């Protein structure tokens, strides 16, 4: 799966007004850069290469560090407590933009449910940082896909919120998105939809990705003011229905 363009609509409004309509200003944003071998736009010549082992030894990671990675990470490059801004992703939806069909949707439980779950179970420190997706092979042939994400912000203002998302198949990079959320006000609920336009994948690559579930993986790195504060992971299978 590879991408050639990504756009977003970002809406921010205070949490206590999230049920009201018309409370936020909508900004339409574009990714600063998209890379991907399938799209013919992969140019790493100006990027300094880094190994994961090198980055694990650093106290502070910046965007140029993760852009220099040539393979998916095996470890998390920051701790959950590094998210000092209280950024919390509460809803995620993937849809086919051409038909409007919802392909995947997940929402975080409400506060009351979370409290009950925390009392009854011991949560792993990495809970919520990893997602596993399963799609049918037809997903790899979609041309336009929208990914809607909703997140809340804590008491601190978030300056220059940025996400770098890198997708790999068998440790070969498929695509890399570099996306600016911009400024988020304190105690706000924000929604954005990333609109991906995918070029046509080769039949051989589609076959390999379908026959090898969960060997397609991704790293999502989140930065505030150029400092890494969150790192999420995902893996993907495209053999649904088989």
Curated annotation (Swiss-Prot):
One Gene Ontology term from the biological process aspect of the record:
cilium assembly
GO cellular-component term (any): ciliary transition zone
Task: Enumerate the GO terms in the molecular function aspect.
Answer: lipid binding
The answer to whether keyword Protein transport applies is: yes
Region of interest called Disordered, as start-end residue ranges on this chain? 1-49
Q: Where does tetradecanoate bind?
A: 133
- Identify the Pfam families for this entry: GMP_PDE_delta
Q: Where is the composition biased (Polar residues)?
A: 38-48
Its keywords, alphabetically, are: Cilium biogenesis/degradation, Lipid-binding, Protein transport, Transport
> What spans are recorded as compositionally biased (Basic and acidic residues)?
1-20
The reply on keyword Protein transport is yes
Q: Which domain of life is it from?
A: Eukaryota
As for what it does, the entry says: Myristoyl-binding protein that acts as a cargo adapter: specifically binds the myristoyl moiety of a subset of N-terminally myristoylated proteins and is required for their localization. Plays a key role in localization of proteins to the primary cilium membrane.
**Domain remarks in the entry?**
Adopts an immunoglobulin-like beta-sandwich fold forming a hydrophobic cavity that captures N-terminally myristoylated target peptides. Phe residues within the hydrophobic beta sandwich are required for myristate binding.
Q: Which family does it belong to?
A: Belongs to the PDE6D/unc-119 family.
Question: Under what name is this protein listed?
Answer: Protein unc-119 homolog B-A
Organism annotation: Xenopus laevis
Q: Gene symbol?
A: unc119b-a
């Amino acid at each position: 799966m590879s991408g050639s363009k990504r756009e977003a609509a970002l809406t921010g409004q205070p949490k206590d007004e999230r049920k009201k309509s018309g409370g936020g200003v909508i900004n339409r944003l574009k990714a600063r850069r998209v890379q991907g071998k399938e799209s013919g736009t992969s140019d790493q010549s100006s990027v300094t290469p880094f190994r994961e082992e090198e980055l694990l030894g650093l106290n502070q990671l910046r965007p140029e560090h993760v852009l220099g990675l040539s393979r998916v990470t095996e470890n998390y490059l920051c701790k959950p407590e590094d998210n000092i801004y209280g950024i919390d992703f509460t809803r995620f939806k993937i849809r086919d933009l051409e038909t409007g069909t919802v392909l995947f949707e997940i929402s975080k439980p409400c506060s009351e449910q979370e409290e009950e779950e925390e009392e009854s179970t011991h949560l792993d420190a990495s809970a919520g940082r990893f997602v596993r997706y399963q799609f049918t092979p037809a997903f790899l042939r979609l041309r336009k896909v929208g990914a809607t994400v909703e997140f809340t912000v804590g008491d601190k203002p978030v300056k220059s919120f940025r996400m770098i998302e890198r997708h790999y198949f068998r440790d070969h990079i498929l695509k890399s998105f570099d996306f600016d959320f911009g400024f988020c006000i304190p105690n706000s609920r924000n929604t954005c939809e990333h609109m991906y336009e995918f070029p046509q994948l080769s039949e051989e690559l589609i076959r390999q990705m379908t026959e090898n579930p969960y060997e397609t993986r991704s790293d999502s790195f989140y930065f505030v003011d150029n400092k890494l504060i969150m790192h999420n992971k995902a893996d993907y299978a495209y053999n649904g229905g088989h």
